[in-house]
């Protein structure tokens, strides 16, 4: 038995017993054949069906997964990785440092929970990571007889359904959430792609549940857009001056018009009132000023193919499917002189906060979770456990250097890059915007330094994985916007997998072209000249490959796809795939020696040098950048270069800090100060607390809408699954009659109005309006008699309609009823979302009247929801009783 790890560590002590059980099973599993291992999983599935509990299956399942990983990937889970898997299975967040193998750790709880056959979702932040992880980790699952699915944005409904029905599915948060919304808009049961939620593991959980928590996922329809107003409002901003006509609130990203500004705009527009509800100009003007004063090209967005594309402030990635709401996106389009696209109205929406709480079992992984532990616990009921590293961390985090202004800071960064690069030590520089990454690139050009740049520009995004993977090579300088969610490990000396993929692609395409051009005699000498790794054995296998007609029919893109999906379990389906696999092994053998030498050289140089160019609003983003070096016990160094006019210091540093620094900094020399570092830390904490309160406030409000959404979606699913909805129709009609009679009883409505309302609803005349002894018949009945009479009238009318429709064939009535209910439910829900948005904006003003806005919102939202349910009943009965088949 192995020695227990770090006995003084509480988390290891907590799971030590299970770790011992897993390790004790290892030797016995090693002697089993592949088929015997798979039989073990089948046995566990049977045990689960009998007990309906996974608790007694954990040790064996984890041990089986570890052995499967060793046999397929050549990777054996460390004990600390087993702990990470146990934390995830325990519905917690595992904080694991960069390079500690989060992707591999997720396979442990994934295999265990897949035993239930209810499905496991592993959520990543982008399509590349989902595809990469499904291909690589899928080898473990398939070895154990479990199938894996992958969701990509170009998949059809049937493809999505098939992949969601797999035991373990890799999917992005974006695709998963939109599939949920689309499922709840479906009019056909066959179009639903998701099955009931079971277990979810979120990679980069802080990015999804914290950074993107405030961004609702919205499905929308286009609506009429006053294009002229956006253009005119944009032109008006040329005649406005900051502080005179408007003030900028940078902290809240808001604009406040001054009295002089309002008058100036009214004069330009030749109107009396900017706020006139019949023709309001104020939202267009405010958005136009925001577009010019708060949102900048190559910072908050880029212009791509004549469209505004948002840049994610946390990851530096573009988000082509996202648009700012409330007319802001159109205002920015007007500012950039682009075609103004139509505004939209919300059809369905949900936040990540509420979506992921739908899972009965939820867990997540991140490299930086402890800084937001309180928020995870309060909102998601997820605690954060810090997983020990497999090797000691050798990274040096040097004190921040603070300069008096931006000019001094950026010049110093370029100068330091020049000095560090003389030794060959690789450098990774993190910037906050596209604009700043390109400005730094220009400064490095002045020193004649070569570099790679990674930002939201399309030409850079295409090479993202390669750029990040090779950032650890000797003498490499890499400039990258925020490094969150980049996903690729930076290996000192360079990542040979990317090098091999590129080199073999070049070899195969070059050779194939020589063969097709019938220049057989010169292609081998050309290869030897261009690629120094070519051996005679390599050439022999390559020659046989080039004689394979199936291979010669492949396009260059097909070859690239095969290389990217190199899979040791499923690759050898054809002879040419076997040959490619051999060539890959040959290249690995050749390059591994060189990579090991390069790795030692870079380690001796001090490892990767990280330069931060600005403190971010969140400590997590800074830590993600720092965590890119010093992976798996490697050496590394990190340092942040700051200036007095950085946004964090300028907006949140406080006047005392500003005054202290101004008196201390008389030239371009940097300042190192413990006081300043603490001030920066506290400034970040204030920003984080502020952001947390905003997210908490959003959650409190959205929770009300979420409860209503859950009711609507549950009701919708029941209707969709029901063979017949006659009970619902009868209940709707009877409830309408009861509500109307209660209004009559409470003297809220006159008898004549009631009769007209019922006749309009039923589509037939009622004898209640006849006069007897100078009185309407309706007034001669008791409440109970009237209710009984009207119920009978409704039942007869409904039955008559069913008989009328039945002649068109079996199932016509059922399908029509279902469609009418669902279509009207969707219309009512869409209207309700618009009203809730307006209510959310309106209740904020009630705070000025000493009323609690949240309480007001809850109360009004309840009444609005009940009213919408009443409207739904009326619409369904009205449409059904007037329906006909054309």
Regions found by a protein language model. Name each.
Residues 306-309, 315-318, 568, 603-606, ...:
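Extended, charged helical/alpha-beta scaffold domains that provide interaction surfaces
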Residues 1-660, 664, 714:
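Conserved P-loop NTPase motor core
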């Amino acid at each position: 038995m192995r020695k227990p790890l770090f006995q003084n560590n509480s988390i290891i002590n907590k799971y030590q017993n299970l770790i011992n059980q897993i390790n004790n099973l290892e030797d016995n599993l090693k002697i089993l054949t592949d088929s015997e291992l798979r039989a073990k999983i089948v046995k566990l599935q049977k045990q689960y069906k009998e007990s309906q509990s996974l608790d007694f299956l954990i040790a064996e399942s984890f041990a089986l997964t570890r052995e499967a990983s060793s046999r397929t990937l050549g990777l054996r889970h460390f004990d600390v990785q087993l702990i990470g898997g146990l934390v995830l299975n325990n519905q917690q967040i595992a904080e694991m440092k960069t390079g500690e193998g989060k992707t591999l750790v997720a396979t442990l709880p994934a295999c265990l929970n897949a035993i239930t056959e209810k499905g496991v979702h592993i959520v990543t932040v982008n399509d590349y990571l989902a595809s990469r992880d499904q291909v690589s980790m899928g080898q473990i699952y398939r070895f154990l007889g479990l199938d894996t699915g992958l969701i990509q944005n170009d998949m059809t409904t049937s493809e999505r359904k098939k992949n969601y029905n797999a035991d373990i599915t890799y999917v992005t948060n974006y695709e998963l959430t939109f599939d949920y919304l689309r499922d709840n808009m479906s009019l056909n049961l066959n179009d639903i792609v998701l099955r009931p939620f079971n277990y979810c593991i979120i990679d980069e959980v802080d990015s999804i549940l914290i950074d993107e928590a405030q961004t609702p996922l919205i499905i929308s329809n286009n609506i009429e857009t006053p294009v002229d107003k956006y253009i005119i409002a944009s032109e008006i901003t040329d005649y406005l001056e900051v502080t005179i006509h408007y003030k900028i609130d940078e902290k809240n990203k808001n604009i406040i018009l001054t009295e002089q500004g309002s008058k100036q705009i009214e004069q330009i527009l030749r109107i009396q009132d900017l706020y006139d509800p019949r023709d309001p100009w104020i939202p267009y003007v405010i958005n136009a000023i925001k577009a010019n004063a708060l949102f900048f090209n190559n910072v908050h967005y880029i212009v791509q193919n004549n469209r505004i594309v948002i840049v994610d402030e946390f990851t530096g990635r573009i988000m082509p499917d996202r648009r700012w709401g409330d007319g802001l996106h159109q205002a920015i389009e007007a500012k950039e002189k682009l075609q103004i696209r139509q505004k939209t109205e919300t059809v369905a929406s949900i936040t990540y906060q509420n979506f992921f709480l739908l899972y009965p079992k939820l867990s997540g992984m991140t490299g930086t979770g402890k800084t937001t532990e309180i928020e995870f616990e309060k909102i998601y009921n997820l605690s954060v456990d810090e997983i020990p590293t497999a090797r000691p961390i050798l990274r040096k985090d040097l004190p921040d250097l603070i300069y008096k202004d931006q000019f001094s800071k950026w010049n110093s960064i370029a100068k330091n890059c020049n000095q560090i690069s003389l030794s060959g030590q690789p450098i990774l520089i993190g910037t906050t915007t596209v604009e700043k990454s390109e400005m730094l690139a220009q400064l490095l050009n002045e020193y004649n330094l070569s570099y790679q740049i990674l930002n939201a520009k399309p030409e850079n995004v295409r090479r993202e994985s390669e750029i990040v993977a090779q950032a650890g090579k000797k003498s490499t300088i890499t400039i990258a916007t925020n490094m969150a969610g980049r996903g690729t490990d930076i290996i000192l000396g360079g990542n040979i997998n990317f090098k091999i993929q590129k080199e073999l692609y070049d070899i195969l395409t070059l050779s194939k072209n020589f063969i097709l051009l019938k220049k057989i005699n010169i292609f081998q000498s050309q290869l030897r000249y261009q690629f120094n790794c070519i051996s005679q054995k390599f050439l022999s296998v390559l020659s046989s490959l080039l004689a394979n007609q199936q291979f010669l029919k492949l396009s260059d893109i097909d070859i690239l796809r095969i290389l990217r999906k190199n899979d040791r379990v499923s690759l050898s389906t054809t002879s040419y795939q076997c040959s490619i696999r051999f060539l890959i092994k040959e290249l690995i053998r050749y390059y591994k020696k060189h990579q090991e030498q390069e790795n030692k050289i870079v380690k001796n140089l001090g490892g990767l040098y990280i330069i931060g160019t600005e403190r971010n609003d969140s400590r997590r983003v800074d830590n993600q950048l720092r965590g890119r070096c010093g992976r798996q016990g490697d050496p590394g160094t990190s340092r942040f270069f700051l200036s007095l006019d950085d946004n964090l210091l300028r907006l949140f540093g406080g006047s005392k800090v500003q005054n202290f620094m101004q008196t201390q900094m008389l030239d371009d020399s940097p300042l190192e100060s413990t006081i300043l570092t603490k001030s920066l830390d506290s400034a970040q904490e204030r920003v984080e607390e502020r952001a947390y309160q905003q997210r908490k406030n959003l959650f409190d409000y959205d929770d009300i809408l979420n409860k209503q959404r859950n009711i609507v979606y549950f009701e919708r699913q029941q209707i969709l699954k029901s063979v017949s909805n006659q009970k619902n129709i009868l209940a709707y009609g009877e409830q309408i009659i009861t509500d109307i009679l209660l209004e009559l009883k409470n003297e809220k409505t006159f008898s004549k109005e009631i009769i007209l309302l019922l006749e309009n609803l039923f589509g037939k005349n009622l004898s209640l309006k006849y006069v007897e002894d100078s009185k309407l018949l309706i007034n001669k009945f008791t409440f109970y008699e009237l209710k009984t009479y009207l119920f009978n009238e409704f039942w007869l009318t409904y039955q008559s309609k069913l008989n009328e429709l039945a002649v068109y064939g079996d199932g016509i009535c059922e399908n029509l009823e279902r469609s009418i209910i669902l279509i009207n439910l969707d219309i009512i829900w869409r209207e309700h979302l618009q009203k809730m948005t307006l209510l959310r904006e309106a209740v904020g003003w009630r705070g000025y009247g000493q009323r609690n806005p949240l309480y007001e919102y809850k109360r009004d939202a309840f009444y609005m929801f009940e009213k919408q349910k009443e409207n739904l009943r009326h619409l369904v009965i009205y449409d059904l009783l007037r329906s006909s088949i054309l």
